[in-house]
Amino acid sequence: NDTPGFLGNRVGVYAMQIAMTEDFKMKLSIEEADAIFGRPMGIPKTGVFGLYDLIGIDLMADVLKSFIKELPEKDEFHEVAKEIPLVKKLIETGYTGRKGKGGFYRMNKTGATKIMEAINLETGDYSPTKKIDVKSDKVDLKGLIERKDKYGDYAWSVISKIIKYASSLVPGITKEFNDIDEAMRLGFNWAKGPFEMLEEIGVKNFFDKINNFSGNSFLENLSKTKNEDFY
């Protein structure tokens, strides 16, 4: 089956947008979001905001417009691709990422001193970056989403939505769900794809926590069988 853009790009860009929009909603710092949507999830350490800066914020805006144009209106991608005022302002003022004056992160040079700064999503102001430690006794995905703090809430919100979106593409876009996992491993350098994440979290655990997945035939079928070895 065909799909606008490569399969990995569709899921990968959706994942980036979910990680970003959920951070705007939950009001974590961008350092916190990148610390969670990074190594703890088996995702490169750039996270989402660092990756945005690396790719180019203006280029990402063009990528989103392309997907919006090509994907049907009912596709959930549209919900996470809406223009964000702060992002629009960054582009307009030349803060397009590493190739520009900076982006979500910037290097502030004062004489011989260089200080890495991060933007505040609410105010648009920059301040020195803070090192975030999200380590816990449980370092697997299941342990991460079961944390009783804002990091656990953010991790679950992001991971569950990525899994829901990826599974909505089966079997309409691809008949083999592991094709999506392979695309994410090869194209975005993830340690595990969405369905491998689901397997690690545990099928029963996933459905104990998730609320609505109506219309998603893959998840509806899996919820009936509760097959932990679906992979």
What are these regions (language model features)?
Residues 1-231:
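N-terminal glycine-rich phosphate-binding loop for ADP-containing cofactors
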